[in-house]
Amino acid sequence: MHKSIIAAAIVAAGFSTAAYADAHSITVGVSWSDFQEERWKTDEAAMLGALEAAGAEYLSADAQSSATKQLADVESLITQGVDALIILAQDGASIGPALDAAEAAGIPVIGYDRL
């Protein structure tokens, strides 16, 4: 996984929210379509390392191959107060409402792999 994706999430969160103004660290939420593939586990380790190095927090959710669950997962990440989202969409056509919710909350989204 490219560190530039993580850097983009951190920069987007830092410039689009008051994350620094209210003295809390940036939290990046990652919505995985299905965490069973070995590739995603490797990518997660890279994400964790990059986020930790930047002083950011990491939250994740595994949709378990369910577009419906992924929508609920993203809404949960938004409710938990993430400053940026990285989404590996289970279904590009079904993820729209989650993207709309993130936009309404002012949360930048990085489409990862399939979006």
Model-derived features: where do they sit?
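A residue-level marker of the well-folded mature domains of exported/periplasmic proteins
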Residues: K3-A13, Y20-L115
